[in-house]
A protein has these predicted regions:
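Juxtacatalytic substrate-recognition/specificity segment
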Residues: 2-116, 201
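Acidic/His/Gly-enriched intrinsically disordered linker/tail segments
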Residues: 69-83, 90-94, 110-244
Length: 244
């Protein structure tokens, strides 16, 4: 018998899930997790969307593609429609594509939409805080030491450059760089940066932060190198990052 799609509404979400699935079994956990993420995201961005976020909890990557109409198989995808912000995510025993990332995309598209994919993903990674359970800043430190570091300047200026880099490198670096901007210069400047985008990122950064993009990156690298990690922490991070 084919599973039946069900629906439940919470304060800020509408969840779709199928009967007899892991998603149904763990639905209350998912609801609590996402509502907590929603509060943290909206508190930081100082913004609450008018519409609820719509979630489709799917069994497989293939099902995500089929139901969403997305062009290829994926664990999660967000359709940035302000009237119907919709997230399709895999949720099964092995993969649970929930948490901050896709919700950040759905919420920020209304108040901190960036024309740069690097900044777009960087904001989501700022909330994720880690890649494969390794803090973004520690990932970045490893890449700097191992000469695998990719410059945020280049990733921000050209989407094609960002897309050409392995996710395990580009995503945590941009997450750490976004944390640097937010922690040191505040959310208002960051939102101003996104709203002021005019195809000239270097000029926009200079106008908003009164510093060049390169100067900000230099400060960021100095901050990363000034953090203290034990040899064991660095070695453990390397093993995880380079094992895949």
């Amino acid at each position: 018998m084919e599973a039946v799609w069900k629906e439940v509404e919470t304060e800020h979400y509408t969840f779709h899930y199928k009967s007899g699935t892991v998603a149904e079994k763990e639905l209350q956990q998912v609801i609590e997790l996402q509502e907590n993420c929603y509060k943290e995201i909206t508190d930081k961005l100082k913004f609450i969307p008018e519409k609820k976020l719509i979630y489709w909890l799917c069994d497989t990557r293939v099902e995500v593609m089929q139901i969403s109409g997305f062009e290829y198989e994926t664990n999660g995808v967000t359709f940035l429609d302000r009237e119907n912000p919709t997230i399709y995510a895999v949720y099964n025993e092995e993969v649970k594509c929930v948490g901050f990332h896709e919700d950040v995309h759905a919420i920020s598209c209304e108040c901190a939409w960036s024309g740069s994919i690097a900044l777009f993903e960087g904001l989501a990674m700022y909330f994720d805080k880690e890649w494969w359970k390794i803090p973004n800043e520690l990932c970045t430190r490893v890449y700097i030491e191992d000469e695998k570091y990719e410059k945020p300047v280049l990733m921000i200026l050209a989407d094609e450059y960002f897309y050409g880099i392995e996710d395990k490198i580009s995503y945590p670096i941009m997450g750490a760089f976004t944390a640097f901007l937010l922690d040191n210069y505040g959310i208002d400047k960051y939102k101003g940066l996104c709203r002021s985008y005019d195809d000239e990122w270097e000029q926009t950064f200079q106008s908003i932060y009164e510093k060049s993009l390169q100067t900000l990156e230099d400060e960021f690298v100095h901050m990363i190198l000034s953090q203290t990690y034990s040899p064991q922490q660095l070695e453990n991070a390397r093993k995880k990052l380079y094992a895949r």
